[in-house]
Amino acid sequence: MADTAPQVSFKKRSVKKTNFRKKPESPPPDADSDSSFTSSDDEEGHRIKRRRKNAAVSASSTSNTRRTTTSDEPATAGAAVPLTASNDATKHSNWYDDELNEKNLLGTTRARPAATGADAPDGTYKGAANYQSFIQKNPNAPAKTFGPIKAPTNVRTVTFMDYAPDVCKDYKLTGYCGFGDSCKFSHMREDYKQGWELDRDWEVSTKGKNLGGKVVSQRGGQAGEDEDDEEEQLENIPFACIICKKPYQNPIVTKCGHYFCESCALQRYRKNPSCAACGAGTGGVFNVAKKLNGLLEKKRERARQRREQAIANGEEVSSEEDEDEDEEQNSS
């Protein structure tokens, strides 16, 4: 009997039926009643009091206000700044304004009577303020302003005074520049004078003389008409070698028509076979410049004539030109 297990039975408890009160439906509140509470009676006589619910929903809570303020801040911070037209390019410089002069700001000390017409004098002296003008003025005449004239306010001028112009060193030493007309430096070999010195020299040179032409370019007489191709050729020939910056030693000429020293041209050809002046290929062809000495002699003669003419006119001659002439004569 010990092997038999005891039987266990579970009792299922039944759920007690409880009497739940059914809440009766409350009648709708009157629309005219102002009280926020409503009351109703149930079946057993108990009075139930309910709070009246507002039909309208108010959204004026603190959290909503904070959210609205926070959401509005980025919109205000990211708003585009309004652009204002400055018109700096066409801005006027009103240094003196007619509306802000002393007369309009301070006013006149004494108001003069309006000119109604000249009356016949009755012999009574009424003071200097009552003087009358019997001159009939033209009412249509424009008003005259006295004093300095007002300068335009919408015009800007930029003045650059170049007292020491940059001179091309290659052109000043040799008379040749590889850049040609595109060189940014001045191709000049003379000294510079102030404006009053130039005016003085012009007055001294033209005093008591009849000038040949009506314009400045024709006042040299027939000098401008005698220029020919030879003059242009002489101007294009450097008076010194552009490689060594010294007078020509055994000059040679290339196929492109440029002159160099023989030693300078051969030494350059070992490293660069192109022409030192124009960059064209020489091909190793260097001819003896037989006519160069004659051309340079003509160029020196014309420079000497111009120098003598300048001295005769009372003009100053650069000392560098004298040194160049001495060196050329010594080398020849």
From Swiss-Prot:
User: Region Disordered: what ranges?
Assistant: 1-95, 299-332
In its UniProt record, a GO molecular function of this protein is: DNA binding
Is Zinc given among the entry's keywords?
yes
Q: Which GO terms describe its cellular component?
A: U2-type spliceosomal complex
Which segments does the record annotate as RING-type zinc fingers? 241-279
Do the record's keywords include Transferase? no
Residue spans of biased composition, Acidic residues class:
317-332
Q: Where is the composition biased (Low complexity)?
A: 55-68
One matching Pfam family is zf-C3HC4_2
Subcellular location, record wording? Nucleus
SUPFAM superfamilies per record: CCCH zinc finger, RING/U-box
What's any GO biological process attached to this entry? snoRNA splicing
Which sequence ranges does the entry mark as zinc finger (C3H1-type)?
162-190
Give the matching CDD domains: RING-HC_RNF113A_B
- Return the Basic residues bias intervals: 10-21
Instruction: Give the matching Gene3D superfamilies.
Output: Zinc/RING finger domain, C3HC4 (zinc finger)
The record's section on InterPro entries has: CWC24-like (IPR039971), Znf_CCCH (IPR000571), Znf_CCCH_sf (IPR036855), Znf_RING (IPR001841), Znf_RING/FYVE/PHD (IPR013083), Znf_RING_CS (IPR017907)
This protein's UniProt keywords:
DNA-binding, Metal-binding, mRNA processing, mRNA splicing, Nucleus, Spliceosome, Zinc, Zinc-finger
Its family remark reads: Belongs to the CWC24 family.
Subunit and interaction comment: Associated with the spliceosome.
Describe the function of this protein.
Involved in pre-mRNA splicing.
Indicate what this protein is called per its UniProt record.
Pre-mRNA-splicing factor cwc24
Species this chain originates from: Emericella nidulans (strain FGSC A4 / ATCC 38163 / CBS 112.46 / NRRL 194 / M139)
Upper lineage is: Eukaryota, Fungi, Dikarya, Ascomycota, Pezizomycotina
The gene is cwc24
